[in-house]
Amino acid sequence: MVRPAEKGGGTLFAHQARAFEALGSEKKEYWSRLSSVNASTGVVHPLVHQHPLLGRNAVWLHLGMTGAVIEKIAGEDAFRLLNEDQLIELCHQYNDLLNFGLTAGYSVKYEYDANDCLFIDNLSVAHRAAPEAHSSPEIQGLRIMHRSTIKGVHHLSPGFGLPPFFDIYSPSPFGDGVWKSGGIGFRWDAQARMQN
């Protein structure tokens, strides 16, 4: 962090294995059959994955870049896309799960100081900007930070025989449902200010 904003603008971090453990058994089973498709790259990630080093199941969904969610239909060799209402509900449930972690002990809001340097494991820790981080510099103050991402050595296979990516800019291979390409993906909450 070169310069933190004068009026907040921290980052919320959540331990994704602990978040998965907080889910009920029916939701764990359902979410384990879901895979998200990145709105810009078409990369497919399982909503629930096993951490390659820790061996714990963790939940993962990018609220700002998801273009589609594919469901493996239980007991069948078939897939379908979530429709708009289902994807909105899923995103709200995931967002609520992250927020619940603030009181349940698996999420934290970190406010930056100058010269802070943080490292996180993206396979086990979710992060998102606090709402005030999207305020204008006139309201929040100017924040200057550098971010770097290290390419991982473990790929998250989507499972169920799905390919590692789809051409998100072509028509959906799954028929009806949300299939949104580009920008910040599917807008699940019109009130949520998003910037990527």
Regions found by a protein language model. Name each.
Residues 1-116, 123-196:
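Non-heme Fe(II) oxygenase catalytic core, chiefly the N-lobe of the double-stranded beta-helix
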